[in-house]
Regions:
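Conserved ankyrin/ankyrin-like repeat signature
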Residues: 64, 96-97, 130-131, 160-161, ...
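Ankyrin-repeat-protein effector appendages
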Residues: 2-18, 25, 42-53, 138, ...
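Ankyrin repeat boundary signal
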Residues: 77-78, 109-112, 141-145, 172-175, ...
Length: 241
């Protein structure tokens, strides 16, 4: 990943983390409690193979991963931070390993990390359309309850992924636990083309989250004048009809 891409992704993750904090702590805790995370209990004898497996995932070493899986390693294993291999592959843009894991019949493609993030969400955030398409081809859920892949793609302005998700019936006004929509995330990030794409696909710019903020409010709060101008123009068009 380039430095610029890494900075963009970090900024988007920061925006998502901040938006998450706006949700009710009780509701968010409940959502996490309901998230199914298949974790592997690692014995000391298995520690080295697990470390090797995780390293192979990070470096997109598909041969290394396949060898360890052939020896009986669980494709739903997690690292020491509770991140499942498939989610880790999506975070690291390890597409070859991702394809191998998805092809494994034992892999849970909806598996989540401790924050409730799955591989589709991470691939959407990173702009990895190949990984997104790989998951969609395996019938991965595009309409995850709460924070959804569309929020993550919109947060970083990945229009190609936004379009793919919408083409596969992603709900354009998906609400996070605190009612934040993909349009709000795109507006917050100043992604003009993403805002337009979402609006053209039916996003409701009048929706408010739990603290009463609309997409326009987000754009104003985070000082995104181009988005403010565009959303204001859309509102005026609506009022004239």
């Amino acid at each position: 990943m380039s430095i610029a891409a890494s900075q963009d992704t970090s900024a988007a993750r920061g925006a998502l983390a901040s938006a998450r904090r706006g949700a009710s702590r009780v509701a968010f805790a409940a959502a996490l409690a309901c998230a199914a995370l298949s974790s592997l209990v690692v014995s000391p004898a298995q520690a080295a193979p697990i470390d090797s497996l995780i390293k192979s995932v990070k470096f997109d070493d598909v041969d290394g991963v396949n060898k360890l899986l052939a020896k009986g390693m669980d494709p739903n294993s997690v690292d020491n931070q509770g991140i499942p291999l498939l989610v880790l592959a999506a975070r690291e843009k390890s597409d070859k390993v991702g394809a191998a894991l998805v092809a494994n019949p034992k892999t849970n493609i909806e598996i989540q990390d401790k924050a409730g993030e799955n591989a589709m969400m991470m691939a959407a955030l990173n702009g990895d359309i190949d990984f997104v398409n790989l998951l969609i081809a395996k019938d991965a859920e595009v309409n995850k309850k709460g924070w959804a892949p569309l929020h993550y793609a919109a947060a970083n302005g990945h229009d190609d992924i936004v379009k793919v998700l919408l083409d596969h019936s992603a709900y354009v006004d998906a609400g996070s636990p605190n009612g934040t929509t993909p349009l709000m995330m795109a507006a917050r990030g100043g992604h003009v083309s993403t805002v337009k794409l979402l609006l053209d696909n039916g996003a409701d710019l009048t929706v408010k989250n739990q603290i009463g903020m609309t997409a326009l409010d987000f754009a104003k709060t985070y000082k995104e004048p181009d988005v403010v101008e565009g959303l204001t123009a859309r509102l005026q068009q609506m009022q004239q009809k």
